[in-house]
Amino acid sequence: MRIALFFSAMLVCLGAVAAPNEPATLDRSTWPEQLISPALFDVASRAEILAFAHALLVSETLDESALKQRLGLKTINLDTIDNLRKRMWQRLLANYNLAQQSCDQDASFCYYVDGMDSLREQAGKFEIADDSFYVAWAEPSREFHQRYLDEQLRKAALFPQISSEIELFGEQESNGEAMHDRLFSLTFDSGPSQLPGTTDWLTDYLRKQSMSATFFVLGNSAQVRLDKSGTQALQALYKGQCVGVQGWEYRSHSHWQDWQDSILRTTALVKQVIPNNYVALFRPPYGQRRADSGGFFQAQGLQVSLWDIDAQDMSASLSAEQSAQRVLSLMLLWRHGVIAFHDTQDKVRTALPWLLKATAQSGLGWEDCEVL
């Protein structure tokens, strides 16, 4: 019976990971202005907020049957979906108010919003005229926000049977929603890469940029690097960076019988080999963890570190630049947060420099990894 339940759960998890549509991305060349000032960042931010708010408002007109069909699911958790929508509306309102602070410098997409009712009203009638300066962006943006919203609604619909970053289980968990405006944190999963590899390039690149990130390592991958190159090389690899843990293998920790041992073994290895870089953070692969795991993490002094901006760089359907463009669009929408890349993906060699160049003059801040 236990084996049957295990395989049943794994089939459900695999179905959740494989979303029915390709990940959403938005060609940023359709936006006619470069983000060369904080005010121009705000213009683009206001536009993305209104476009997403419009998509969110439209989704609320769907009844349960229509929503199931749209998400490609037979059963959905309406309560979690409703909670997600409420949180999204609250964040959209806060973000729009922040983005409007520069309206005296550029009034594009500045509308009267003094609360939730007026935001919903503006979202309902939001459209781009055919002769607008921004018309080339209008349809690609509409498609992006609908697809991105569906990604999020689908995760909420499956929660908590299939856990993900869409919802927190308790105080031992965090994501990027509480960060300050215009502040972002870089995180990288599933490393270190094989030697030599993307992790080596990435940590060197970050040091040259005087930046730091949190790397969530797999115990087996770290052990391979340790066996091949030794302790000093592993310490040099992560110099100036932070290292959290992601378990011994990149697999779901929600239905794995040895999930606790996976975390304990990896934590012990990292503390022993690179103690000066260790931070007490666990990043669950796929965002999947047990609903009752809070006590374990508290006892171990670990925080579950989730994210709210996903690069989707493991998707074969997205190029490196498309992954970076997705991240930038979500940075404009959410205005702060934890960005999740994978340092085992070669795409990051192109995606990260593109992202940093595109935002270099936009007044953003990058959180020091030790603050995460």
Where are these predicted regions, by residue range?
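Short, intrinsically disordered/low-complexity patches at protein termini
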Residues: 267-269, 329-330, 364, 372
